[in-house]
Curated annotation (Swiss-Prot):
Keyword set includes Kinase: no
Protein name: Insertion element IS1 5 protein InsB
Organism field: Escherichia coli (strain K12)
Entry's family note: Belongs to the transposase 27 family.
A Gene Ontology biological process term: DNA transposition
One annotated GO molecular function: DNA binding
Lineage: Bacteria, Pseudomonadati, Pseudomonadota, Gammaproteobacteria, Enterobacterales
Coiled-coil blocks: none
């Protein structure tokens, strides 16, 4: 009976305290810095939004194409500062070759390192972007499921990366 439901006529209230307690790590523990070498690291950024599409939130991350795992990730605006935060997380790792798309900030940040700019060599991370969009509805471009706060957006996606790649 519709009248017997405790939520009849109003939306149920959700308790997000368990999500707010999440403390996802930003770097993998599967690869030991200094002892393991990352031969090919693909880097890319993925667009998302919080509340409205005008409030963009970017996920920058590096993907080890041989181990098929995410090495590190950061959230922020699509700027050199966010890319710098990702690079500082990756600095303890011995990366031989960096592979990126044609975004100009990658070229300026990776000057002096072995850097390949090609769509052909970033297809694994681009496929991983698609997998993230398929698994996490809040990353979909046209979806009714979107994040309402920056904190929960970062924690939910970070927790997913922890479960699938960092443990």
């Amino acid at each position: 009976m519709p009248g017997n439901s405790p939520h009849y006529g109003r939306w149920p209230q959700h308790d997000f305290t368990s999500l707010k307690k999440l403390r996802p790590q930003s770097v993998t523990s599967r690869i030991q810095p200094g002892s393991d070498v990352i031969v090919c690291a693909e880097m890319d950024e993925q667009w998302g939004y919080v509340g409205a599409k005008s409030r963009q939130r970017w996920l920058f991350y590096a993907y080890d194409s041989l181990r098929k795992t995410v090495v590190a990730h950061v959230f922020g605006e699509r700027t050199m500062a966010t890319l710098g935060r990702l690079m500082s997380l990756l600095s303890p790792f011995d990366v031989v070759i960096w592979m990126t798309d044609g975004w100009p900030l990658y070229e300026s940040r990776l000057k002096g390192k072995l850097h390949v700019i090609s769509k052909r060599y970033t297809q694994r991370i681009e496929r991983h972007n698609l997998n993230l969009r398929q698994h996490l509805a809040r990353l979909g471009r046209k979806s009714l499921s979107f994040s309402k706060s920056v904190e929960l957006h970062d924690k939910v996606i970070g927790h997913y990366l922890n479960i699938k790649h960092y443990q």
